[in-house]
């Protein structure tokens, strides 16, 4: 291998893995495939994972108190080897948008009336017993009835972003704007002959309708594609979520789940992320004070190096693969995470996001997680993604069938049909 060769790995760690397995829901549910949707829903049954790890409490703390005796002491917030104990299954129990919606400007907290109204608005979409736009492709693409899906109550804060004070992602650098503009222009060109642009829907914002499909259909994307496009020539035209490659950092939850299982051993920490739809992934944090990997070694989840600052776990993450994509940031993404146990059932997470090639300044997100029951999450299975294993060949085969039908005069030109299924929105992120 050449000395300066770049190595890309899909593993979240370098070294010996810690076995982690995915948790089945407590109840039987139907998980909807959201294909880029920004609506955040909470599955009614908790989900997580299980591992075999060192105990964190003494036998006396675990045993129930006998009648008439002094109650057993509360579990310690330290591990058996003396480190702050962050272990358990954790989730955020309320819905908070990443960015503050423009209509709430510099308002840091919702009023109770605003929270109630936002809950009402989401309840009209999720949990309903009717389907919208019957007979349309959009209806077929969202074939699960929303009655099977629940939603989380609106949180008190108007954004997860705590800094800048306006709760918004900082402006892009001029170079990042240029790159984003080129990608957007390419995807809009592939949409121009669809009903989406003809009807001037939000997904075509900034584009225009033209009944003839764009000659750019024959072009490669401006750079490695991570988002959905209106073309299915091959697997590379499908988005990362469609290919079950959504796992990545930072992770702020998604449409079908936001659970973390933290496991500690002397000298090591692993975090398993359950993101719903049968998908999950893990990362291992190196705790031996060693430096980051060489710059030519790149990993999907980056290279995590942790240390303790008092009761806070501080993790520095670098060495991301250029094939990942977080808000336009790829190989230059740098994260500093802070995990702090704030009580027996509460955990605070803070992450500062930095990429000087993408944003004008660093920005910080804060989240609060609640401890979930290990007993209720005792059934487990390996995470898997049916869409990634079986759906993609069907999507590509279906496109070839549509093309043959069009050539034989039996159907419309596939280029005039929006295959993106609502997955392309440019305006403010709605409340999830």
Language-model-derived ranges and their functions:
Residues 2-7:
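Extreme N-terminal basic, low-complexity initiation segments
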Residues 10-29:
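Short, Lys/Arg-enriched N-terminal segments with co-localized hydrophobic residues
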Residues 27, 31-43, 47-432:
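PEST-like low-complexity, intrinsically disordered acidic/proline/serine-rich tracts
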């Amino acid at each position: 291998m050449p000395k300066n060769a770049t190595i890309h790995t899909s593993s979240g760690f370098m070294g010996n893995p810690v076995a982690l397995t995915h948790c089945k829901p407590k109840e039987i549910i139907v998980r909807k495939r959201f294909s880029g949707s920004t609506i955040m829903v909470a599955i009614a049954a908790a989900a997580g994972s299980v591992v075999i790890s060192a105990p964190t409490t003494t036998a006396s703390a675990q045993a129930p108190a006998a009648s008439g005796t002094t109650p057993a002491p509360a579990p310690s917030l330290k591990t058996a080897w003396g480190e702050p104990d962050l272990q358990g299954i954790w989730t955020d129990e309320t819905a908070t948008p990443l960015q503050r919606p423009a209509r709430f400007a510099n308002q840091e907290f919702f009023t109770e009336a605003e929270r109630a109204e936002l809950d009402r608005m989401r309840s009209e979409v999720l949990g309903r017993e009717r389907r919208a736009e019957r007979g349309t492709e959009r209806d077929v693409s969202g074939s699960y009835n929303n009655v099977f899906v629940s939603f989380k109550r609106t949180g008190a804060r108007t954004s997860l972003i705590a800094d800048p004070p306006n709760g918004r992602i900082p402006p892009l650098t001029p170079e990042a704007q240029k790159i984003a503009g080129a990608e957007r222009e390419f995807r809009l060109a592939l949409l121009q002959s669809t009903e989406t642009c003809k009807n001037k829907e939000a997904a075509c914002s900034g584009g225009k309708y033209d009944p003839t499909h764009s000659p750019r259909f024959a072009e490669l994307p401006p750079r490695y594609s991570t988002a959905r496009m209106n073309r299915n020539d091959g697997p590379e035209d499908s988005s990362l979520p469609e290919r079950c490659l959504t796992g990545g950092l930072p992770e702020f939850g998604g449409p079908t789940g936001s659970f973390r299982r933290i496991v500690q051993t002397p000298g090591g920490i692993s975090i398993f992320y359950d993101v719903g739809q049968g998908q999950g992934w893990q990362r291992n944090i190196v705790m031996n004070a060693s430096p980051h990997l060489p710059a030519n070694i790149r990993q999907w989840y980056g290279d995590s190096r942790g240390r303790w600052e008092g009761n806070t776990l501080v993790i520095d993450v670098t060495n991301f693969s250029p094939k990942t994509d977080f808000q336009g940031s790829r190989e230059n993404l740098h994260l500093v995470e802070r995990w702090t146990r704030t009580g027996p059932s509460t955990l605070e997470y803070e992450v500062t996001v930095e990429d000087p090639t993408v944003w004008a300044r660093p920005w910080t997100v804060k989240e609060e997680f609640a401890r979930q029951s290990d007993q209720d999450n005792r059934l487990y299975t390996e995470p898997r993604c049916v869409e990634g294993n079986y759906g993609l060949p069907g999507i590509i085969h279906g496109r070839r069938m549509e093309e043959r039908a069009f050539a034989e005069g039996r159907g419309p030109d596939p280029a005039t049909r929006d295959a993106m299924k609502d997955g392309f929105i440019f305006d403010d992120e709605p409340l999830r």
